[in-house]
Amino acid sequence: MLTAKQNMIECMKPGGQPDRYVNQYEAIKLLFHPFMFSSPAPQKGQLNVVNAWGVTNSFPDNVPGAFPVHTPDKIVVKDIEHWKDYVKAPSLDFPQEAWDQCKAMYDAVDGEKAFKAPFIAPGLFEQTHHLCEMVNALYYYVDYEDEMHDMIKYLTEWELKLAEGICDHLHPDMIFHHDDWGSHDSTFLSPSMFEDYFLDSYKQIYGYYKDHGVKYVVHHSDSYAATLVPDMIEMGIDVFQGCMKTNNVPELIKKYGDKISFMGVIENAFVDHEGWTDEECEKVVRETVADCGMHSFIPD
């Protein structure tokens, strides 16, 4: 019987022979890096916590996660034409003790059974709308192209320095990188605009990781992003995690399954609602695995 890690590798590789469905995150151990400890984040019930980028986040009791607060007084970028006056990248110079603390977590994982994957968030697109506010950011992508290109370059350089520290000190064999690129039914940017702003930056970031020991890139975007799959492949993404059913994953597997795998489809709306039943959950899971199969697909 294959280990969870071996089975996931067989699922992902062309012509692989997995001996069972990949069991969600069984083969992926999400781990920390020092920046996660140095940037304040709200715990459930906490409001208006300012992180290392100056973004204010809240985590009310009645929601599943924290989110940026964008009342006018809390938006970081007050004037996009002078964004450099507002956006100040936090330091990534950490003492060796901080790296050692994280390395102990990596060393505790059995690398034969699971991937060691640092969790990296937010991604480039998310960071722009965290700093600017979502509607503002989308407007700036259309009317302030030079400023947004420059901001993304600045964020990319910071991410590359983060990648350098992670690879030099922690030596992961996988990364789990977060950047939501769409809603339930559409991407936030057209494919051509997305490529113009993000393709080269992510090729640099994911290319750096793969040039320094990382074998697999899992990119999280719990959204529709089917039209961006060719770009994901070019960026070096191995798993599109969080893909909604609206992506028509069986068709994506037929078209791209020899180049990228897909993790998702079982949406919360189908199985996590008031009055849910075991029978209903089982029905959704069985239908999903029947539609998508065992190769290039991880039910989640």
Residue ranges and their predicted role:
Residues 16-58:
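N-terminal accessory/capping or targeting/presequence segment of soluble
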Residues 34-38, 61-65, 69-72, 130, ...:
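Short aromatic-enriched loop/helix-cap "lid" or pocket-rim segments at secondary-structure transitions
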Residues 47-98, 108-117:
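A contiguous, low-structure linker/loop signature
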